[in-house]
Amino acid sequence: MLSLMMALGIVSRIGSGFIADMIGGTATLLIGSFMQGVALLLYLYFNGLESLFIVSGIFGLFQGGIVPMYAVICRELLPPRRAGAAIGLAVSATIFGMAFGGYFSGVIFDLTSSYRMAFLNGLLWNAFNLAIVSWLFWRGRRRQPVGELLAA
């Protein structure tokens, strides 16, 4: 199951790059984060082996392209002299969040003996991510992209 998820995550990373070239990093991240949330929601309703493989595949198709979009967004929204530090901060926060999130969901499972609550925890954090990305998307549509300013 994990191998399937990771293999499709590779497809997601490459595909997200192509999509970002067409619609931008923020829009791509918004789509990927939303679809990752849908996949997390599906985990709540399926528990058979076959269905878990299918849901894991769906999850892999969307989660793999999320982290690379943080670097794309930093470069889209920031001047080159600030983008490097912002990318480092974004990736560090992502790594911390994944490490803490996995641990915290394990604690939730240990306390409740339920994967349902652990996946709900993931959905809450996904909603938080979607709120931030939605704000960036809305804000970015009102401003001229840095790339256009530099080209002028």
How would you name each of these model-derived features?
Residues 117-136:
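Symmetry-related core transmembrane helices of the 12-TM Major Facilitator Superfamily/SLC fold
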Residues 19-20, 104-113:
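Interfacial helix-cap and linker-helix signal at transmembrane-aqueous boundaries
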Residues 39, 50-59:
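Paired small-residue
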Residues 6-14, 64, 95-99:
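Residue-level signature of mid-helix packing/kink "hotspots" within the transmembrane helices
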Residues 80-90:
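Loop-to-transmembrane helix entry/capping segments in MFS-fold secondary transporters
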Residues 65-78:
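Intracellular juxtamembrane helix-capping segments at the cytosolic ends
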Residues 34-47:
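C-terminal ends and interior cores of transmembrane alpha-helices
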